[in-house]
Regions:
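Boundary/entry segment of secreted carbohydrate-active catalytic domains
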Residues: 21-45, 187-188
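Conserved beta-strand->loop/alpha-helix structural units within folded catalytic cores of enzymes
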Residues: 38-39, 51-55
């Protein structure tokens, strides 16, 4: 038996399979790319979804429950979820920590005035709302403004049973063994060209890493914006490079990472 195991471990087939796993750790691809869209604005429905669906690409849309687009176009958001896109949780009212440089934060939704209980309760309420939209009980979360604490206390620890993963905003990439599922890094888009975003993808493939991209406005809807032609050109590039890139919603990639890291 020992001789058999030794011969198996030394066999070319074993090393070939091991090499293949090391070279294609992301669902048999070199890299994973997750497209995320924050705040549920009309331009996601008007400008992002048509391109994504025409190319057969699936993304994650981080939904703030109070969004006027959700209120006015709810059936379209339901259709989006039914078509394979993830509706992620981006809180009920999009609270952020106010202060210098963030004068736009409304006093009622200033996270510096929140309690841990209020943050957790509002976030869980948004989960209930999203479940009513898509029927799903598993989803991921995105920190608003990248703010992760109420005072000095992190709140995500209280929500780990509610979410498979949580996306933050630090611009870094990590290999599958180094991904922190409750502090997933991402690159946010603010005026970048398709060519600039393509460089992110090339780096992810070279380093066999997870690349998460954060869009806000797509042809408008937010001051953090990408032009429609650049967005379309970038998605077309992704589609052309599916042989190297696994492109999937955050929930699918997070569950894959969780399974990998548990072994």
């Amino acid at each position: 038996m020992k001789k058999y195991l030794l011969s198996l471990l030394l066999s070319p087939a074993f090393f070939s399979n091991l090499t293949a796993q090391n070279n294609t750790p992301w669902n048999n691809k070199k890299a994973a790319v997750v497209l995320t869209y924050d705040d549920a604005v009309n331009q996601h429905l008007d400008n992002a979804i048509p391109v994504l669906d025409s190319l057969g690409l699936k993304a994650t849309f981080y939904i703030t429950g109070y969004s006027s687009s959700i209120r006015d176009r709810m059936n379209e958001w339901k259709k989006l979820a039914a078509n394979g896109h993830e509706l992620g949780n981006h809180t009920l009212y999009h609270p952020c920590v106010g202060g210098v440089g963030r004068e736009w934060v409304q006093p009622d939704y200033d996270m510096s005035k929140y309690t841990l209980r209020r943050m957790v309760d509002e976030t869980r309420m948004n989960n209930v709302f999203l479940q009513a939209l898509d029927g799903k009980t598993k989803r991921t979360f995105a920190f608003t403004c990248g703010d992760m604490k109420i005072g000095d206390s992190s709140f995500i620890g209280l929500l780990k049973n509610d979410f498979v993963a949580a996306r933050a905003v630090r611009a870094e990439m990590h290999t599958i063994d180094k991904v922190d599922l409750y502090n997933v890094d991402c690159f946010y888009v603010n005026g970048q060209t398709a060519a600039q975003m393509m460089e992110w993808v090339k780096k992810a493939v070279e380093t066999k890493s997870l690349l998460v991209i954060l869009f806000h406005g797509v042809g408008g809807g937010n001051s953090l914006n990408v032009l429609v032609p650049e967005h379309r050109r970038f998605l077309q590039y992704l589609k052309q490079n599916e042989k190297d890139c696994w492109i999937a919603p955050m929930i699918e990639v997070a569950e894959y990472v969780k399974k990998y890291q548990s072994h």
